[in-house]
Amino acid sequence: MKKALWLLLAAVPVVLVACGGSDDDKQTAQVDYLALPGDAKLDTRSVDYKCENGRKFTVQYLNKGDNSLAVVPVSDNSTLVFSNVISASGAKYAAGQYIWWTKGEEATLYGDWKGGEPTDGVACKER
């Protein structure tokens, strides 16, 4: 199933992913068009986060059937679409070198790796 999801993501037409600031310097990620297969209803949810480094941003979660995605602004200039992957605890999403791992109201964004494990994550909390 996960292999099929990765193949799906390679073919998913993400026409526009926009990232913009607001008055309180919070970044917002938004997907304007994303085609996912199946007849299930698309469930979307936006969650605001504030991180230990002071950064504020909004993550958009998209769920449809077996497909779960998170649109995360990983930096001031880059927003990525993450795919849900297997985790022992919480919800774990991957995009390239990045991991977005949530559990309850807490989340961590990892961008560096050592020995096959993510390191130096930035901890964030829902606001």
UniProtKB/Swiss-Prot annotation:
Site note Directly involved in lysozyme active site inhibition, residues: 89, 103
Record's bilayer topology term: Lipid-anchor
Subunit structure: Homodimer.
Signal peptide (residue range): 1-18
Function: Specifically inhibits C-type lysozymes.
Species assigned in the record: Pseudomonas aeruginosa (strain ATCC 15692 / DSM 22644 / CIP 104116 / JCM 14847 / LMG 12228 / 1C / PRS 101 / PAO1)
Compartment(s) where it occurs, according to its Swiss-Prot or TrEMBL record: Cell outer membrane
Principal location class: membrane
Keyword Repressor: no
Residues with lipidation of kind N-palmitoyl cysteine: 19
Domain of life: Bacteria
GO cellular component, one term: cell outer membrane
Record-annotated disulphide pairs: 51-124
Name of the protein in question: Membrane-bound lysozyme inhibitor of C-type lysozyme
Family annotation (InterPro entries): MliC, MliC_sf
Lipid moiety-binding residues (S-diacylglycerol cysteine): 19
